[in-house]
Amino acid sequence: MKIFLAAEDTGAIKEVVFDEGMDTSVQDGPQPLITSFAALGKLKHIQKLALVTTSKGTKYIAAARKNGTIEVYPYLLTEESTPIFVYSAEGAEKCPWIGLTQYDDNTVVAGLEDGRLFFLDVSKVTIESDKPYDAPTASVKGPLACFALDRELYPGKIAVGGKERDLEVFGWAVKGDEVTVRSEFQARNVKSNEIDMRVPVWISGILFQASDKDGFRVITATRHGQIRVYETWHGKRPKWDFKVTKDPLRTLAPGMDASNVVSSDAHSSTFKFNFADNEKIVLKNKDNNQNKEHNRKSPCVVEKFPGSLGAVLHLVTTDNGLLATVGLDRYLRIFDLETTECTAKMFVGTQVSSLLFVDTERKTAQEKHVEETAEKEDDELWNDLDKVEKKSNKRRVAGNDEGKKKLKSA
């Protein structure tokens, strides 16, 4: 398996290749293969990472840095790797990146806290990397803390939110150099509390889910410890507003199915939260280690993921039931989503500002390393052959020109 990390201390991309069962706290145990690339220092550290796959199947790594640039790297990184393309957004060095993800087959979208979104056509910039590029840009009301999209469920839709910026879903259309944006859903805050005080808004995570009716189903996590479920046919206020914890929620990711999500707070808890009503669920009894079936009619925290010392800052889930987390203790942990068992634990030695799970196939780290080394050597060989062919073509053209000159002089 392979994960890319953004190292805040050095500004590098760290590639971690590992097996399930690894634990770096065991001195004589197997160790992951950790390699650093593109270290530009803390002042230019990466705030967001994204994997981009073009319509032709070519993969790239996109990185949004603190200095306001977006860099595009080859997927198979080497110690000599440099960006294929660098885009500088005006004024972005004064404003943090709050999101970076693939928008469509060839486009990556990057968002700033001030509400600006940039759409970069990776297929274009990697071919014409030496030419000036002006990314199509549009703005929405800020400040934003996060944005989300789901290319399969709701293509062309992006949801945004932030501090005193309630959930809003926009429809986007990118044609050439122009971007058009239209608001399609604006959430309303919940009603005032029992002492008639306004409930504050501070969205920290957004997640689209499949809808069985026309409209959107959107989940949000907040810095006030709430998880909210919006169904647009239900109304502009959340269908559910559940207080999960007293601590701020920092993350939000899909669970095993549409009935649950995974989140973490600013203390040390990472948990599965189930919000499907009128169903039977199985909860573990920690006293006797036996499972018991319960009828549940309201959302609840199902199970917690153990082990983290301090806040989990970033997490990501995979389609094959894995959860990866990194936190203040500088450990990368891998969990089984269903059982909550920790299947790998690795000290990465840096504060992590972004996390990208790019390969969930359960091969051994050594097998993966051998495969990728062979791929890199093949790429280098083809590049060398291309260079030789270009040189021979130039010589052939030069020889033809010289021959023509001699014929004319004769």
From Swiss-Prot:
Cellular compartments per GO CC: nucleolus; preribosome, large subunit precursor
Key words of the record: Nucleus, Ribosome biogenesis, rRNA processing
Segments for region (Disordered): 366-385, 390-410
GO aspect biological process, one term: rRNA processing
Gene3D superfamilies recorded: YVTN repeat-like/Quinoprotein amine dehydrogenase (2.130.10.10)
Biased composition (Acidic residues): 374-383
Main localization category: nucleus
Annotated localization: Nucleus, Nucleolus
Entry annotated with the keyword Hydrolase: no
Subunit structure: Component of the pre-66S ribosomal particle.
PANTHER family: NOP SEVEN ASSOCIATED PROTEIN 1, WD REPEAT-CONTAINING PROTEIN 74
Protein's job: Involved in the biogenesis of the 60S ribosomal subunit.
Membership in a protein family: Belongs to the NSA1 family.
Identification of the protein by name: Ribosome biogenesis protein NSA1
Organism per entry: Yarrowia lipolytica (strain CLIB 122 / E 150) (Yeast)
